[in-house]
Amino acid sequence: MIPFSETLILQCIYGSQVSRDFLAKTEGLQNLIQDTQESAKLGTLRGLKNYQLHLRSPHSAFNLLLQSAGAIYMKQYLLEIDNDLRKLFTHGKEFGYVANIHDAVNIECDPEVVEPICKILTNGFEKASVALGLRYYVKGKPSVGHSQWETH
């Protein structure tokens, strides 16, 4: 059992207020959630790349839409960076994939190719956004370190 701490108590007290403030102050978010729930009454939603998403219940529609968009985006991102990495480097020699966890890809590489690999990883965000036809591009940047602990 987790012991009570001042931090835990404050998170419980103010966490819901932060969520309410975010919802209230993010223009269009409430409308998007309501429109998504309204569309969900038909039992399915259309996700990125026109994928059909099957719902268990209308109240979970927005979460399903977000989760599927994240998964589709990450798959496209991985395709983009893999194509570019393999144009310049040999998998298993200069670089290798270690893990792909939710919204992060872990790569190990030779020290002399860190910079060009970081450039490929950074450019991959725009390439994936373009490939998926997003109006607002996802942005990100790689973290470099000797371990998972150093990069997170």
Please provide the spans of the model-predicted regions.
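Conserved catalytic core of nucleotide polymerization and phosphodiester-bond processing enzymes
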Residues: 1-152
